[in-house]
């Protein structure tokens, strides 16, 4: 803020209020300084998991266009097909393994569950209701995308995992895959 009378700054437009306290700023600076260390740990853990899982016939991994730009935040496993992925996810759930996302059935991140979009349900009128819809969203089909996302299971990687935790996760994933 400017001056000594906090709250007297002008607000040129709605939505811009960048004030933070010195404490928040100090915490933010400290966290930002740790980002390179976190990325390094995440990448190492991701590579370790890939090495531990790569021998299994069910798993394949995405080829990244810029591996140097990968933060190592997620490990994406591709299974042979949607049905195999569903069975694999069921086994993970039965084992109580958390921390993964199966986007194919996710309520927020994939079109299969986007009834509010496909049926254009909103609180107010949409421009396409006035101007016309460029396509019929109710019958929208994305078979290539569904085939890819149906095979994908993603795991969030935590930089705080110990070597034992990484091995335990890999063993649990292999156990679930071997039950298929």
Predicted regions and their residues:
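Proline-centric
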Residues: 154-164
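Short hydrophobic/aromatic beta-strand micro-patches
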Residues: 76-80
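Short amphipathic alpha-helices in soluble, non-transmembrane regions
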Residues: 86-95, 169-173
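Conserved PLP cofactor-binding pocket of PLP-dependent enzymes
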Residues: 3-6, 48-52, 89-152
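Short, amphipathic alpha-helical "lid/cap" segments that border enzyme active or binding sites
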Residues: 29, 163-170, 174
